[in-house]
From Swiss-Prot:
Annotated compartments: Plastid, Chloroplast thylakoid membrane
Gene source species: Panax ginseng (Korean ginseng)
HAMAP family: PSI_PsaI
Alphabetical keyword list: Chloroplast, Membrane, Photosynthesis, Photosystem I, Plastid, Thylakoid, Transmembrane, Transmembrane helix
Protein name: Photosystem I reaction center subunit VIII
UniProt keyword Amino-acid biosynthesis, yes or no: no
Superkingdom assignment: Eukaryota
Family in the record: Belongs to the PsaI family.
UniProt function note: May help in the organization of the PsaL subunit.
Membrane topology designation: Single-pass membrane protein
Cysteines joined through disulfide linkages: none
Keyword Thylakoid found: yes
Length: 36
């Protein structure tokens, strides 16, 4: 567990998870608008 290795793992994780969550919530919002 090195201090330099932690950000290098965290950055791609956040860079992938955050957009994925954003797109998922966006698609859910679009689906809700289409059904109503």
């Amino acid at each position: 567990m090195t201090t330099f290795d932690f950000p290098s793992v965290l950055v791609p994780l956040v860079g992938l998870v955050f957009p994925a969550m954003a797109m998922a919530s966006l698609s859910l919002h679009v689906q809700k608008n289409k059904t109503v």
